[in-house]
Every structure is written in C-alpha cells, then in structure tokens.
C-alpha cells in the first residue's frame, strides 16, 4: 500500500477544529478566497452574502424568500438562500410556526388585496413541498397546519392558490427511499451462491458491507443532522441510531468471528481475512465501515491475543499498521481528512468525525449577532457541511449486491455485547500468562467516541423479519429438490458462519433439518445475541402432567393422558412439543429448587468446553449437571437485568462449541468476607449422573485464584453458596426477623393462590364430569323404562 496520505504540498491540520472554523467564518464574512483552507470537506463555491453577512431578522429572511419568486413562479438569484432557509430553519423556529407565519402573511395580503404577494407566498410553499416533501411526511403537526392553510385559501375562492399548495403530490412519492432502486441485486451469476464465511472472498464481503453501510447512510436526512447537532446525541433519532448500531455491530462481529475459532492458527486466518477486507473497503472509499473493521481488529480483546498474532505474517501486520495510521485521531484525523478530500465519485465518510465538526461549528459561532439578528453566516456554513453529506447519498456505489448474502449479514450483525463480555471471550481463548508482563487494556485508537455506548435493541418483530429473510435465502440456495429440508452438514457450515452457535436440534428426519427447525434455531440465537432477555436457554424435559396445564408459549391446552408436553426444570415453563423450539422468553431460574434437581454445581464464571460432534447431545444446551442459581440472602431482587449472568455460545470451524457463562459484575453482599472466586476455568463435562442427590454437591467449593482475572480492576465475581432450603429460611429468619417472615408469607401466599387456581380448575372439570355422568345416567334410565314398557 505504501505510505498513506502523505502530501507535501498540503499544510498540516491543527489539533483542534475551532481554528479551521474560524478561518472558514472569516472567508464567509469577507467574501474572499483563502487558498487551501483546512476545512472539513473540500472547498465549495460560497454564495456571496453581501449585507446578510451582518445578520438579518427572521421576518426579513422570510420576505427575501418570498420575493425570490416572480409572478410566473420562476426563481431569481436567491436560490441558495431558499435552500438554507427551508433546510436550516429548524435551528430558529419549528416548521409549524414557520408555516403559521406564512399563513398570517397570506391573510394580511388578502385583506390588503395584494394578490401578487399572495401568489408569491404560494409559490414559496410549493417550492417547500416539492423540494423538502419528507418534512410533511414525517411531521404530523406540519401536515395538519397545511390542511388548515388549504381550507383558508379555498374559503377565499382562490382555486389557483389552492392547487399550488396541494400536498396530494406527496403521497405519490416513494418516500421510503429504498436502496434497491439504485443498487440492483446480482442476478447475473448462475453459480450456486455460497453463504459460508470461509468461502467468501474479501472483495465480495467488502462490497456487501458497503451495501449495508450505504443503505443506512443515505437515509439520514437534513433534520436528522440538525437534531444531532442541537441535542448532541442520537436520542429520538432512529436513522442516526441505526447507522451507529450498524457500525458497532460490524466492529463486534469482527471481534466475535476471530474469537469463534478454537486455535490460534484459525484465528489468525480470520484476522488476515478481515485485514484484506479492510483493504477492499479502502479501495471502495468506504471509510465508515473501514473504521468499524479496523476498530474491531485493534480492540484490546483481539490485540491481547499474542499466540494469534504470532501466526499473522509480517506483510499483513504492516498493512494493518498502515490502516491504523490512516484512521488515527492524531492531529484531528489529519491523514483521514487528506485521503477523504482526494477521493472523488462514490465515498462514505466517517460519520462520527464530520458530526464532531458540525457540533464544534455550532458551538463556536453564536446563533445571533448584535440587535438580535440571526447569524446567517453560521447557517450558511452549517448548510454547506450538511449538504455535502446529503449529496453523497445521490452517488450509487460501484457494486452489485446479492440479496441472499445481504440477508445473512443483516442477521449476523445483530450483536450487542458489553466490553466485559468481549474480554470474557478473549480470556477464554487465551488465558493470561502470569510470566508475561500484564497487558494494559485500552480503547482502540481509531474508534470514534460518538458511537460508543449506543446499542439500540431490535424488537422481536425486526429479528423475526431478519431471520425469515435469511432462512428463505438459505433454502433457495441449498434446498435444490425443494422438499423443505437441508442436510445436517450444510446446516452446520451455515451455522459456523455466525459468531454464535447453540444447541444440537431435534431433527424430523435422520440427518435433515427442516425450515421450521432452522427458523427456531436462529430465532433463539438472535434473541440471545441481541440481548432481548433470553439470557438462558430453557432446560425442557418431557413431562406427564397430573392436572390441567396450558402452554406458556401459545396459551393452548396440553392434551393427552401421559407426556402431554415439556417443562423447563429451571424456571417451570410449560409448552407443547412443537412450541419448545419457538420460545423466545428468558429462562429465569428459580431460587427455590428441590434437592433432587441440584447436582454438582459450577463455579461462578466457569467455562465449559462441549464437543458438538457427539450424537448423544440433546436440546439441553447447558447440560444436566448445571443447577439453578440462587441468592442465599434473598437479594436477588437487587440484581437488575443488566447484571444477570448470561450464556454466550460460540462455534468455531472445527465444530467445537464453547459456552461462556458470564456472571454479575459486582460481588454479592453475602460473600464480602470470601476470597475472590475462580473467574474462568476449562472443564470437560462428565458423563450424566444419577438423579440421586449428592450431599457433597451442597458443600461450599474452596476458593481458587483466578487464572485470568478481568482487565477491569474493580470488577469482582459473585460467589454462589448453595444450601438446604430449610437452612436458608432459618438464616433469613435470624437475620431479618419479621421482614423475612413477611416475605416468606407473601411467597407462600402466592404459592397457595396458584394451588388454589389449579384446584378450582380441577373442581370445575370434576363438576363437568359429574354433570356428564348424570346426563348419561338419566338417558340410561329413560332408555331402560322405554325398553321395559315395550316388552
């Protein structure tokens, strides 16, 4: 690649954005040209502001916009002023109030019989509707005010004016702005499309990531940029939030795909592949996705993998260093700005860098000048910066997208992990070596701060849509005989393309996977990885119910005499056989459990290596040896959903599954006097044990030093102490007295209510049976009497 962005004829950028903005402001005010001003974007042809450089009132700006139209509706020389006023007025006044001002001017002009001025107002509004019709689609109050304006115009009998401001044309617009109108899916390839990560070329992967990035980028409107500048965050800004979530999702996906490989050699292969993907992204001039990929590769959870790095060639490492230097934040992203300004045609900027520039410009320049006049040069400068980002949306990328691969990537990028969880996975692969000097965790040097901490969670409807599209693509490419099944081998290869993998599924046919089974598989996987609450997989077991029971998933009745359905032994959830693979509710393990259900327990933070090739595995992913978690002192209510332990499953190319159980990030109050427990350990699961309770399993496990403690110094693990239920109740009674007694009574009350409800159902069923028997008895007696009389 060579040295990136080293031009001697360009002045070096400063470390701050403010001096640059001051130079640009000076250029606007004095209407002079400054050679090679280090602006955020290439120099634009500035509109000479003239007297507007000293500011103007809002009414004066409105009058100038109206007078820009002649009686035939043609515009004069203030075309850019119209654009600035209509796009940037949100900094000054809401759109509804601007329309109300125009309506007031129209009423006054009608009273003064100034019909030419009324006509110009209508031309101005028509221009607003034509150029910025999205505002009327997204703002309900603005639409309502426009309807009131139309009624006012009709009441005066001005049919021509009414037609000019008619908003019916908006409904015919394709306002959804679908990307497929500009980038057609690749239908020319007749070969079988591979959906496997190992078979994808870096060029192909980079193109489809660019497709997704451009799709999110081009949906950001003027108002979205304005809202971010004013609020400084993405709250109530869904399009901006989706763009940031995609960037974070790609960064985490890169890390997880590396960590999903079991050996350093395989991890080095994935690492090398993503570096080549970064090269292709640079060639496509997609800097935003390039930032996400390099940020993932430079993350501490990846950079600490010394064994993995030792298998990466020197040339590949050199390319990574060059990319990191290109995206470095030194000198206010000087290298990136030079490379970006030299690019022509299609390009996707690093959105976070340009948003920071916009905020700096907004903060550096006042909104008003002397005599409460609007700072028009500030609006003009903000408009030029935002408008360049908007204009980039009109340039289609030079690529062809395969929608099947797009659907697979869309689903695999729905990932939301915390920093601690990423470190847990990293330490599971390469535990800390105490002989080597400790690696100080640090943030990646290229990740923009604006994107950190933004993880909008998709709703179940969105996840279901992504899963359904991906499953349709899988069966279109792999179900050649169209019988609704794919082979077990093909399914395992597809599942290995994701940075997560869960349990071995039940198959309707030997060696075949149905559409329903693969849909249920990815629904459960996506629900867990997107943190929708499914923190634990259910431990379903076939059960015979002795009382009427309903399915907790579909609310249907569990029919049958024996083995009517399945019951989770951890949380008690009941469901049909056909519903147990479709459950997307979290398995909330109960603190109360019988002695027979508690076998040998794992330490907090324990990691289990589970071979996936065995045929004896069932749908129980956590194994029969893992018991429910309980808080000895009844403090489970203080642990929020964020601090709940969570299971992450990974599967590498060798079909070996790793289950990393993540524990709460704070130490439990009941164990403040205990030593810190083991953080992570490797254990091969033992053969299934008998259900006879083992007394040794209830003894406290001796604490062991952690072989790979968390990189966060203050982070400690919870220690679970398992005791008999009676002893727990006695301890609570001694420590809490009356309060514990009240809590126990409330729990008993809830339990009795449940029992009472079940007994009522049984009683009603018994009454129905009695009535049925009575009816049959009466019928039998009547038939007997009739027979006797006949004889």
Curated annotation (Swiss-Prot):
It is found in: Cytoplasm, Cytosol; Cell membrane; Golgi apparatus membrane; Endoplasmic reticulum membrane. Ca(2+) 1 binds at residues 479, 481, 483, 485, 490. One of its GO terms (biological process) is cell differentiation. Regulated by F-actin polymerization and probably by calcium. Keywords: Calcium, Cell membrane, Coiled coil, Cytoplasm, Differentiation, Endoplasmic reticulum, Golgi apparatus, Guanine-nucleotide releasing factor, Membrane, Metal-binding, Repeat, Zinc, Zinc-finger. Ca(2+) 2 binds at residues 506, 508, 510, 517. It is a peripheral membrane protein. Residues 466-501, 502-528 form the EF-hand domain. A zinc finger (Phorbol-ester/DAG-type) spans 537-587. One of its GO terms (molecular function) is guanyl-nucleotide exchange factor activity. Residues 671-715 are annotated as: Disordered. It comes from the Eukaryota. Residues 201-432 form the Ras-GEF domain. One of its GO terms (cellular component) is plasma membrane. Residues 672-681 have a biased composition (Polar residues). Residues 49-172 form the N-terminal Ras-GEF domain. Residues 728-783 form a coiled coil. Transmembrane segments: none annotated. Gene3D superfamilies: 3.30.60.20, 6.10.250.2730, EF-hand (1.10.238.10), Ras guanine-nucleotide exchange factors catalytic domain (1.10.840.10), Son of sevenless (SoS) protein Chain: S domain 1 (1.20.870.10). Functions as a diacylglycerol (DAG)-regulated nucleotide exchange factor specifically activating Ras through the exchange of bound GDP for GTP. The phorbol-ester/DAG-type zinc finger is the principal mediator of the targeting to membranes and is required for functional activation through DAG-binding. This is RAS guanyl-releasing protein 1. It comes from Xenopus laevis (African clawed frog). The lineage of its organism: Eukaryota, Metazoa, Chordata, Craniata, Vertebrata. The gene is rasgrp1.
């Amino acid at each position: 690649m060579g040295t990136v962005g080293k031009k001697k004829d360009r002045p070096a950028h400063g470390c701050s954005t403010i001096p640059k903005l001051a130079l640009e402001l000076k250029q606007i005010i004095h209407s002079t040209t400054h050679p090679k001003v280090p602006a955020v974007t290439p120099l634009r042809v500035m509109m000479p502001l003239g007297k507007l450089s000293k500011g103007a009132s809002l009414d004066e700006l409105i009058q100038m916009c109206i007078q820009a139209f002649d009686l035939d509706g043609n515009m004069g020389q203030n075309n850019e002023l119209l654009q600035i006023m209509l796009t940037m007025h949100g900094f000054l006044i809401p759109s509804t109030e601007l329309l109300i001002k125009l309506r007031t001017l129209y009423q006054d002009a009608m009273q003064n019989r100034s019909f030419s001025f009324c006509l110009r107002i209508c031309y101005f509004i028509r221009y607003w509707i034509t150029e910025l019709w999205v505002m009327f689609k997204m703002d309900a109050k603005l639409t309502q005010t426009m309807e009131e304006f139309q009624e006012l115009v009709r009441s005066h009998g001005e049919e021509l004016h009414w037609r000019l401001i008619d908003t019916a044309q908006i409904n015919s617009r394709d306002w959804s702005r679908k990307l497929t109108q500009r980038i057609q899916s690749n239908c020319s390839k007749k070969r079988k499309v591979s959906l496997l990560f190992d078979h994808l070329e870096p060029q192909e992967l980079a193109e489809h990531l660019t497709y997704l990035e451009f799709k999110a980028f081009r949906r950001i409107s003027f108002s979205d940029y304005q809202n971010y500048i004013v609020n400084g965050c993405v709250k109530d800004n869904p399009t901006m939030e989706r763009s940031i979530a995609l960037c974070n999702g790609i960064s985490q996906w890169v890390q997880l795909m590396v960590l999903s490989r079991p050996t350093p050699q395989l991890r080095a292969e994935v690492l090398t592949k993503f570096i080549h993907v970064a090269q292709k992204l640079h060639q496509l001039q997609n800097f935003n996705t390039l930032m996400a990929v390099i940020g993932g590769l430079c993350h501490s959870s990846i950079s600490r993998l010394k064994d993995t790095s030792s298998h990466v060639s020197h040339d590949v490492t050199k390319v990574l260093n060059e990319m990191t230097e290109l995206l470095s934040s030194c000198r206010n992203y000087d290298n990136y700005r030079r490379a970006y300004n030299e690019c022509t045609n299609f390009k996707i900027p690093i959105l976070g860098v340009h948003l920071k520039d916009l905020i700096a410009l907004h903060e550096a320049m006042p909104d008003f000048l002397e005599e409460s006049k609007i700072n028009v040069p500030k609006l003009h400068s903000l408009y030029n910066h935002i408008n360049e980002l908007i204009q980039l949306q009109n340039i289609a990328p030079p690529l062809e997208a395969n929608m099947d691969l797009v659907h697979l990537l869309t689903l695999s990028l729905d990932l939301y992990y915390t920093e601690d969880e990423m470190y847990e996975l990293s330490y599971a692969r390469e535990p800390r070596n105490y002989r080597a000097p400790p690696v100080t965790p640090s943030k990646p040097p290229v990740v923009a701060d604006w994107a950190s901490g933004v993880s909008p969670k998709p709703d179940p409807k969105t996840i279901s849509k992504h899963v359904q599209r991906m499953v349709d693509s899988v069966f279109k490419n792999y179900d050649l005989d169209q019988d609704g099944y794919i082979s077990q081998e093909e399914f395992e290869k597809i599942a290995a393309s994701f940075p997560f993998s869960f349990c071995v599924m039940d198959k309707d046919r030997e060696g075949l996977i149905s559409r329903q089974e693969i849909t249920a598989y990815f629904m459960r996987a996506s629900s867990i990885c997107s943190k929708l609450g499914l923190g634990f997989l259910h431990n379903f077991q076939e059960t015979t119910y002795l009382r009427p029971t309903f399915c907790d998933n579909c609310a249907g009745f569990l029919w049958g005499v024996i083995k009517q359905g399945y019951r989770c032994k951890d949380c008690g959830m009941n469901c049909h056989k056909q519903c147990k693979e479709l459950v997307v509710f979290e398995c909330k393990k109960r603190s109360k459990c019988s002695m027979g259900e508690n076998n040998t327990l794992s330490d907090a933070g324990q990691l289990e290596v589970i071979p996936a090739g065995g045929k004896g595995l069932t749908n129980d992913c956590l194994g029969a040896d893992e018991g429910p978690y309980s808080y000895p002192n009844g403090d489970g209510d203080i642990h929020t959903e964020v601090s709940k332990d969570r299971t992450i499953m990974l599967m590498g190319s060798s079909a070996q599954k790793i289950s990393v159980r993540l524990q709460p990030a704070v130490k439990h109050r009941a164990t403040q006097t205990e030593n810190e427990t083991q953080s992570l350990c490797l254990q091969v699961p033992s053969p299934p044990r008998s259900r006879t309770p083992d007394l040794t399993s209830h003894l406290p496990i001796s604490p062991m030093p952690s072989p790979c403690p968390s990189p966060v110094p203050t982070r400690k693990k919870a220690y679970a102490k398992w005791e008999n239920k009676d002893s727990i109740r006695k301890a609570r009674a001694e420590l809490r007295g009356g309060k514990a007694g009240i809590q126990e009574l409330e729990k008993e009350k809830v339990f009795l209510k449940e029992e009472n409800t079940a007994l009522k159902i049984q009683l009603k069923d018994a009454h129905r049976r009695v009535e049925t028997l009575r009816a049959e008895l009466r019928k039998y007696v009547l038939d007997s009497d009739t027979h006797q009389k006949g004889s």
